[in-house]
Amino acid sequence: MRVFTMGTFDVFHAGHVEFLRKCRLLGDQVIVGLNTDAFAESYKRRPTIDYAGREAVLRACRYVDGVVPNDQPGGTAMALILAVAPDIVAATMDYHPSNGKDWFAQVGVAEDWFAKQGIAIEWIPYTQGVSSSAIVARL
C-alpha cells in the first residue's frame, strides 16, 4: 500500500518522526509531498530551513521512501495526488475539520473526490507538546 502525506516539515522534530512512523504502519511505501518554500509562505510563514534542507532530512528518515515537491499550482494538490497514485492519504488530526481547520480546503480537493478515486483518508493523532512553530518561537 502506498501512503502519501503532505507538509512543510520545518525544523524536523520527534513529532514529525512519530507521524511518519505511523504513516509507515499504514503501508509499505511512504511518499511525502514536501511544501515548497513559496507555497508554505503563502499560507503560514517562510520555512526556517529551505526546501533542499528539509528534503535532505526527510530522505534520511527511515520511514520515508520518496519526496516530491508540493507547490499546489492553482490552489490544489489534485494533480500531485493523482501523480503519486496513493492508496491512502494521511493527515494529522489537528487539521481535521472537527478541530476547526479544513484540511480539504487547504489541499484544494473536496472530501468526496478521494472516495471517488478509491483513496482512503487516514487521520493520525497529533503529537502533543512539540511543534515547529513553538520551537522557532523559542529561538
Residue map of PLM features:
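Nucleotidyltransferase catalytic core that binds NTPs
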Residues: 1-139
